[in-house]
Amino acid sequence: RHAGQCGPVRRGNSSAYLHLPRVEKGPFRLNGSRLLLRGTHRHEDHAGVGAAMTEEQMRAEMTLMKEMGVNFIRLGHYQQSDIILSLCDELGILVWEEIPWCRGGLGGEQYQAQAKRMLTNMIHTHYNHPAVIIWGLGNENDWPNDFPEFDKGKIRSFMKELHELAHQSDDSRVTAIRRCDFCKDIVDVYSPSIWAGWYRGCLL
């Protein structure tokens, strides 16, 4: 069942009920009630095995997050294992999943076409996971030094294309980006991601 439709979704012997999340003038609401998102970030990386984690290792990792009080996770900048999405469904951890368009460049036509393919593939593969609430369109797209050309106008134009494509593929969820404040008016959710004391500023 498409995630925009409320009702039961069955996978094997389990079922989950879908409820449409809302972001209205800032606060996040789920089932009509305001919910404070307490989250973390995840890359597919584990000591000794890298990204080749077993299902047991993935379950242990996600269970630990749940025990920490996490109810929201932003996945690393690439489509992750379906096992992780299923664990988030099971554990009640809401998900921001995103594509690997990073660091302020557009590349050529092939690069942009691949970004669009990755976005539609991610949505078509994972839209039936009730845990997913956000499709991420990029990461640190305001970073000027990793590509020979840094053109804010072109980045804004392509961000609009991805935003529209995401809503064409799934109109029940919101889009988001991290950083890139000159595109914050394009997406539905903007994360300034301050990282005080790391990228800028201080801890106090």
Annotate each predicted stretch with a short phrase.
Residues 1-4:
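Internal, hydrophobic beta-strand segments that form the core of beta-sheet-rich folds
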Residues 6-145, 160, 175-176:
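Active-site-adjacent substrate/metal-binding segments within catalytic domains
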Residues 54, 111, 115, 151, ...:
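Residue-level preference for long, well-ordered alpha-helices that form the structural scaffold
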Residues 146, 153-204:
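Extracellular glycoside hydrolase catalytic/binding regions
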